Amino acid sequence: KLYSLNTFKGSFGYLWKENIRKEHLLNVTDIIYVSPQNVSDLYQRQADTVPALQRVIDKQLIFGPTYTYTYTNTMRKRKKHTFYFKGGIDLAGTITGLAMGADVKAGKEEEILGVPFSQFVRLEADFRHYMRLGEETQLASRIIVGSGFAYGNSQQMPFIKQFFIGGTNSIRAFRARSIGPGSSKPVETNTFLPDQSGDLKLELNIEYRTTLFSIVKGAVFIDAGNIWMLNDPTPEKNFSSKFLNDMAVGTGVGLRFDLSFLVLRTDLGFPLRLPYGDDRWVIDKISFGDGGWRKDNLIFNLAIGYPF
């Protein structure tokens, strides 16, 4: 056991439906407190040399208003084009930081109950389009864009509010939270890999879905994306005008078992393009007959429900 994180969360707000398609969620205040417990010596030694590991076990106090808007017309099954949109804004520590004159860059870091509170603005949008191709076929696509900016009492976004990419519901050809930031290579430690996190996120997915027989449905997909930092000492981690060159790309196939009360999903993905290195496109290296290639590149995902 490396560490434990105790998380306490509370919120007060309003949820209302404008109509069957539109929903608003306004939390007047959303409070999150994260406290690390039982951090092992092994983990602490690694954290002393890898900042990404240290951020995981930092105490975090986050509070402030949040707002989320959701629109969907996907309930119209016979319609050729349907859409889903979810957008949100998180304003943490804004009023408190201004009232207390917090400015960590000027050496004025303010605390509440002995813990520095986070101050940031976070925006995220998730847009999906579903195109009905036939009675049993569909083309589904999604784009996710997210950005977070820390200021005032914070030098960086708190770990739990940063962005992650890769895994079962993301870029399925890469392991969960293993991509980025930017063109940086995965951090190597002697024992484990940290979750890769960033201040910016761009993800694109497209999936062709069809019924094979009875309750079994098939899918072919392509996923792409990455995360970036805004102001990291390591240049390759930061967002730049060359961000498209940092994109990880993967593809694969999957089966979905529609059991009426739930959908059991399996996906098998492999990378087409790495976000780092000199030779990033790896299509010419695909070799299904090579056991070594399969071990290093094939990623199996098991999940409940559709990825989007």
Task: Annotate each predicted stretch with a short phrase.
Residues 1-144, 305:
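Transmembrane beta-strand segments of outer-membrane beta-barrel domains in Gram-negative
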Residues 3-7, 56-62, 78-80, 114-122, ...:
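Transmembrane beta-barrel outer-membrane domains
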Residues 5-6, 20-26, 97-101, 151-163, ...:
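Outer-membrane beta-barrel and related beta-rich outer-membrane complex signature
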Residues 12, 257-261, 292-308:
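Outer-membrane beta-barrel "beta-signal"
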Residues 42-53, 99-109, 173-190, 231-236, ...:
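Flexible, solvent-exposed coil segments and beta strand-coil junctions
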Residues 50-56, 108-114, 189-194, 237-241, ...:
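Extracellular loop and loop/strand-boundary signature of outer-membrane beta-barrel proteins
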Residues 85-89, 127, 141-143, 206, ...:
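Membrane-embedded beta-strand positions of outer-membrane beta-barrel proteins
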Residues 138-221, 228-231:
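Extracytoplasmic gating/loop element in the C-terminal half of outer-membrane beta-barrel translocons
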